[in-house]
A protein has these predicted regions:
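N-terminus-centered regions that define maturation/targeting leaders and the start
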Residues: 1-141
């Protein structure tokens, strides 16, 4: 059993995400930490989405998508539902939403190019996930 976890120095599990991380505010990336990945981990991946958006926009809204091969100096980011590459903070149109940050420890390096989709990431991660963890936070306009 892995002790893999994901934490954020900017807010606690289940707590309110500070406004500066909101898309319509400063849109700063929160300080996410991947803790105690399995020793055979070669890549860490992150998906941040908003399942509460289903009621407002008819789908789970993707806010952040990235992977980091541990042999590389920086992560490679995918395209969000804002049609932008990189972090797109919370921006609920209809009240308080819960945001889920899902972390994955993988046993293979990935070769997706910047701007990849969530489906592309999920497809290449399949059969390579060593451990998973999640962090939730809430945000209201």
């Amino acid at each position: 059993m892995s002790d893999f976890s994901i934490t954020c120095s900017d807010f606690d599990e289940g707590a309110e995400i500070p406004k500066k991380f909101g898309y319509k505010f400063e849109n700063e990336e929160p300080n996410i930490s991947f803790n105690r990945p399995p020793s055979s981990t070669t890549t860490l991946a992150l998906i941040m989405d908003d399942p509460d958006a289903m009621g407002a926009v008819g789908k789970v809204w993707l806010h952040w998508l990235q992977y980091h091969n541990l042999t590389e100096s920086s992560p490679v980011e995918g395209k969000t539902d804002f049609d932008e590459i990189g972090y797109g903070g919370p921006a609920p149109p209809d009240g308080r939403h819960t945001y889920i940050f899902k972390a994955y420890a993988l046993d293979t390096e990935l070769e997706l190019k910047e701007g990849y989709s969530k489906q592309e990431l999920e497809d290449v991660m399949k059969d390579h996930i060593l451990a998973e963890a999640k962090l939730t936070g809430t945000f209201a306009p």
